[in-house]
Amino acid sequence: MLDLAIVGGGPGGLMSAWYLKKKLGGLCNITIFEASDRLGGKVLTGRFDSAPAVYEAGVAEIYDYSMTGPDPLRELVQHFGLQTIQMDAEQVQLDGELLNDVPGMRRKYGAKTADAIEAFRKRCSKMVSPLEYYEGIGAHDNEHPWAYITAEEVLDREIDDPTAKRFFKVMARSDIATETHNTNGLNALKNFVMDVEGYIGLYSIQNGNDQLIECLRSEIDADIRLNHRVLKVGKTEGGRYQLRMVNGKGPETHDFDLVLMCLPHSWLSTMAWDGEDLRKSMVKHVAYFDRPAHYLRISILFDKPFWGDQIPGAWFMSEAFGGCCVYNEGARHDVGQHGVLNWLVAGSDALAFANLGDKALIDMALKSLPASLGDARAHFKEGKTHRWLSSVNALPGGLPARDVMTNHRPEPKQHPGLVLVGDYLFDSTLNGLLDSSDAATDIILTEMMRLRRKQGQDGKLLSDKIDRNYFENYRGLGPYHEVWNQFTDPAFLVDLIKKVWNRAKGYKLLVAGSASGELVGALRARGIDAWGIENNRAIHGKTPKELKKFNKLGSIVDMPFKNGEFDFVFETSLCHVPNKRVVPAIRELNRVVKTGLMFGSVTSDMPAPLIDRYDLLRGVKKLGTWWEWSELFFNNGFDLSMHRHDCTDALWTATLAANKGPGQWYADSDSLRYSFFDKVEDED
């Protein structure tokens, strides 16, 4: 069994361990090393000493994307059976007065300011749609007109009214956690639209966001070692990864087959890296994302909510501390008869004021409240502070945005099993962190399957050749021409095409990886104008005479077909193409197809027993998960068919009926979802 280390016991480390159990089962031993004496990192729910009142000392809330599409974090919260509380508010404090969004701004500052606010929000809605917002960080961001100008420049260009400009700075400061000159216009834009209906919802977990940490901990299978700070990562002479660390007693050294680094960017910067290739790669990685942003928490307990009904929402935005969010914790948590206000100070103010003592910070927070609320000091009972310096990123995802593989695996040649996890790689949210954990564990899964095969099966080394013997005993069942239809059912294929693209007949289809043409012949017998291409000369030579015209010998990297000659492509051969030629092969498939492609290659996230049973990794040169393959398709002229016509449930029903579900090929409906791609034009 292989050994895997997770460095960091924060939410990223726990999410990764949870995903690994889900994806790998018991295929590896997992050890989590956490430098502190607790799990959870910046997900921290606090309790006051003088009363059993709850407040969020770390992550303030969770983003809800479910109104637009699948929301993995929301689904995870539901999986654990956790209850959630929706959060909303519209108030902003300017010039000492609490105002109700645009109507309040209109009343106090006049129509010119209010109209400027509404006009800029409309402009923002045109600059990024709810669907584009939902899709998050990606290569498409690099083409956005606000990507290469600062947020400060955007505000200066788009808003003439100085009060309206100040309004937007205050409203967004606690989200971007930095100054408008330190981030780009696109990142600010994605925060400006959070106040526009239809983009996002916000919620908190009942009884504290740290319930998520407790639930993750309860479902993972790992050896957790607290107070173990990893200092250096390198490699042994035998090729394993070596971690050097200290605990409460002294130094330790441990070796692993695979390593997940689940550290905040600031802590990643403190690590030492053994070996020049790794050191250079990690220095470049750290530098690329070195845009620290800061938070400071000031949480205050009062004897009662003395403000009465003056704070009707879950928070209000305040111009204090350069623009901060003040949460009314009683709107989401049980604070008893008490009142709790919780300041989220951001950016340079958080960095500067973090140098002050707790008493001074609490005093400043009390002074910042609008006088209309009443005498805050008369009701003060207790205050707590929490400093989260460099805990988030001023430009999450980096600029320009890079592909997911590059971000998560900085040195793939000599250190393919060293993978990173971080919210800074996506959008500096818990949602982004879960996405990062999912992506990173997919990479780990692929590497683990490679290592398993390298070690052999039942102590025997396995052949990697696609030779005559391979086809004479195809996947251990017998001659290819006798057993091919146990893996490819022409009726099932035709049914899937009908469900996804609503085409039952009258189309032309290419089978990419057609062997001796049996599938081509079966499809033609059904009235489909099917053609094939196969690069293995031996098996292609067995093509029946009547199919030779339709089953071509050649490579999918350079095909003898016209542009857009086929309506659809069914491919099973991309995984057998060398890594360097995969992208050219996908582009060539894109060239010859008009409508869509069905992906049928072997993937690393197919169930291990299925892979072992049929030795599916034999001859595979490009191994990846369904998700990794989808990224390659996205970057080369394709998009998920389900984005335009989501028929996942119908596909899954058909798959189960055809006996192609769990234990046969498709483990779940998600694997089907990532098997169908539409050809798209650049402007799409």
Give the residues covered by each predicted segment.
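Short, glycine-/aromatic-enriched active-site segment of Class I SAM-dependent methyltransferases
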Residues: 55-58, 597-621
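Conserved flavin/dinucleotide-binding core of flavoenzymes
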Residues: 2, 15, 23, 47, ...
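Glycine-rich FAD pyrophosphate-binding loop
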Residues: 21-49
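A short glycine-rich, Lys/Arg-flanked "PGG" loop and its adjoining helix->strand segment in the class I
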Residues: 583-597
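Mobile amphipathic helical/loop "lid" adjacent to a hydrophobic cofactor/ligand pocket
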Residues: 77-183, 454
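Mid-domain catalytic core of redox enzymes
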Residues: 228-345, 352, 372
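Conserved N-terminal segment of class I S-adenosyl-L-methionine
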Residues: 452-558, 586, 670-682
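Active-site/ligand-binding neighborhood in enzyme catalytic cores
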Residues: 132-229, 236-241, 255, 267, ...
